[in-house]
């Protein structure tokens, strides 16, 4: 998994998945292009977290300060960010995947989020998302832990809602074909 390559060690994580059944074409591309703009819950949660109103698909995560670190087309896409602020207000400009891996300063926080498609069979599929956070020191970890305590429930709601939207839109598209 790409996420293991870029952030194998971490102190915080969150994992969610959804299962799809049926003979579905183009699942990965539909996952990336899923339109979250019709989800009032996602828009509301993005707004209260101070996130960009323009994040309407997985591919738009770059508008929130993430960079696309890597992709295994048809299987997994990975985004990451580096910051020295536990609330992720000031993301450092990371221009390459290599630079992301090399950053190990004790004043930073590195975060990654992936979206992954696993085909269990031709008619059974799992879409998952995992978020991992690495803190460079005990001091920054304790600051982030306080933030995570309050934000984690909202983060979980966002991820679960995203997966629900992806599943719904993929199944609706399959019915139209």
Please name every model-derived segment:
Residues 14-16, 111-113, 127:
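Hydrophobic residues positioned within well-ordered beta-strands of beta-sheet architectures
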Residues 69-123:
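Hydrophobic-ligand binding "helix-grip"
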Residues 114-116, 128-131, 147-156:
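Active-site scaffold segments
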Residues 19-23, 82, 116-120, 132-136:
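Solvent-exposed residues in well-ordered beta-strands and their adjoining turns
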């Amino acid at each position: 998994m790409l996420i293991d390559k870029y952030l194998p060690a971490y102190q915080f994580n969150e994992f969610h998945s959804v299962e799809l059944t049926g003979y579905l074409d183009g699942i990965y591309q539909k996952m990336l292009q899923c339109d979250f703009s019709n989800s009032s819950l996602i828009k509301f949660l993005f707004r209260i977290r101070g996130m960009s109103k323009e994040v309407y698909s997985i591919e738009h995560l770059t508008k929130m300060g993430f960079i696309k670190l890597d992709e295994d087309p048809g299987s997994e896409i990975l985004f990451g960010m580096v910051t020295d602020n536990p609330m992720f207000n000031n993301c450092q400009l990371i221009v390459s995947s290599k630079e992301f891996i090399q950053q190990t300063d004790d004043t930073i926080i590195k975060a990654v989020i992936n979206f992954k498609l696993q085909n269990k069979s031709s008619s059974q599929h799992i879409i998952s998302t995992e978020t991992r956070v690495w803190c460079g020191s005990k001091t920054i970890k304790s600051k982030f832990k306080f933030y995570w305590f309050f934000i984690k429930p909202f983060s979980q709601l966002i991820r679960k809602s995203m997966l629900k939207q992806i599943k719904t839109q993929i199944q609706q598209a399959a019915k139209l074909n």
